């Protein structure tokens, strides 16, 4: 049960902390759904790097895959270091705020990458994906602090379910916007 603990050594868990933690996933999941999985990835392959397909079919998809792979490889190497520093200096919230700001800025700047600007788009995708994944690692590190014992799975499930809802809501809004834009062309 949220607000209580099975272990007497810990203070009760505040509802607002659990909600804040879960709603971070709600707000954050639109990035993976829209940028990495569906809309921007297709836009990158078709429009930004699409001109390269004439010379080398499949190259736009390869460049997208390289961008995501480089970001994930960097996170693979940096996550243990970032986590150790965040734990040692007790600055998880500051690192989480920084990763969030970098992800938002990197994502917003993607709008400035037009057809043919492959290097800019790749750099921004790499930056935003690194920041996103770093934020995911940092937000997950808060779970043991807001959940105890038998409620950890339930609280984690709240975050996952709100994340899926947030991702689908963001995707729906984006698809609606794209559809309306195409109607008015």
Residue ranges and their predicted role:
Residues 9-72:
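Helix-loop boundary and gating motifs at the non-cytosolic
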Residues 58-61, 149-159:
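Loop-to-transmembrane helix entry/capping segments in MFS-fold secondary transporters
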Residues 100-115:
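C-terminal ends and interior cores of transmembrane alpha-helices
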Residues 106, 117-135:
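Hydrophobic core of transmembrane alpha-helices in multi-pass small-molecule transporters
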Residues 134-147:
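Intracellular juxtamembrane helix-capping segments at the cytosolic ends
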Residues 157-175:
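Glycine-rich segments within core transmembrane alpha-helices of 12-TM secondary carriers
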Residues 183-185:
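Conserved small/polar residues in nucleotide/adenosyl-binding loops
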């Amino acid at each position: 049960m949220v607000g209580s603990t099975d272990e007497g050594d810990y203070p009760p868990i505040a509802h607002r902390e659990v909600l804040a933690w879960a709603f971070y996933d709600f707000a954050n999941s639109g990035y993976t759904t829209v940028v990495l999985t569906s809309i921007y990835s297709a836009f990158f392959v078709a429009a930004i790097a699409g001109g390269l397909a004439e010379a080398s079919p499949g190259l736009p998809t390869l460049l997208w895959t390289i961008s995501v792979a480089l970001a994930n490889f960097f996170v693979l190497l940096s996550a243990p270091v970032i986590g150790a520093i965040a734990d040692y200096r007790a600055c998880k919230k500051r690192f989480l705020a920084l990763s969030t700001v970098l992800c938002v800025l990197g994502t917003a700047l993607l709008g400035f990458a037009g057809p043919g600007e492959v290097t800019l788009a790749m750099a921004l995708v790499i930056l935003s994906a690194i920041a996103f994944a770093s934020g995911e690692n940092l937000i997950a590190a808060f779970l043991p602090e807001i959940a105890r014992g038998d409620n950890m799975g339930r609280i984690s499930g709240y975050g996952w379910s709100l994340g899926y809802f947030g991702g689908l809501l963001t995707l729906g809004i984006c698809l609606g916007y794209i559809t309306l834009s195409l109607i008015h062309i």
